[in-house]
Amino acid sequence: MSYYAFEGLIPVVHPDAFVHPSAVLIGDVIVGAGVYIGPLASLRGDYGRLILEAGSNLQDGCIMHGYCDTDTIVHENGHIGHGAILHGCVVGRDALVGMNSVIMDGAMIGEESIVAAMSFVKAGFQGEARQLLVGSPARVLRQVTDQELHWKRLNTKEYQDLAIRCRTGLSETKPLTQVEENRPRLKGTTDVKPKSAQ
């Protein structure tokens, strides 16, 4: 793992969190229990404070950063999809930010909300609970349904379980030169399916 102190501030990572070895954490970063941080994530706490609360996840290639004297926060059980950028914003408890979305400075995503993939949330946006945000710039499409929230929670549970699985089952290795006979498939821990398959 790549951890860097910056002007005396050292990242804080709970022992029950998983941080992929290729992720980079710099300075004022606080990572809670059961958090999953994926490959190539960049958390640059060289200006503002970056906080990932318990049970949240920050997936592959995500970026967290913020201006001085700001907190960029992913609250408990927050779910940040591949390639998303969080800059000086707050993601509420149990909310989901979809893949390659951008959440700008001073924006607040309400608890149990979903930001659709590829959305752009403008600076200063103040969301409410259970909003479905879509587009660039993002607009409120409607309320998140109970079914969608259940789907989100199953996905978040997968990442909470993945943090545990990676702490014990992930290791650097050399590749095989051929596919072995009867190669097994990996399984998740819930019955979650892609939205298109529901």
Swiss-Prot record:
CDD domains: LbH_paaY_like. Keywords: Repeat, Transferase. It comes from Salmonella agona (strain SL483). Pathway: Amine and polyamine metabolism; carnitine metabolism. Overproduction of CaiE stimulates the activity of CaiB and CaiD. The keyword Transferase applies. One of its GO terms (molecular function) is transferase activity. NCBIfam families: PRK13627.1. Belongs to the transferase hexapeptide repeat family. Residues 179-198 are annotated as: Disordered. Pfam families: Hexapep. This is Carnitine operon protein CaiE. Residues 180-198 have a biased composition (Basic and acidic residues). One of its GO terms (biological process) is carnitine metabolic process.
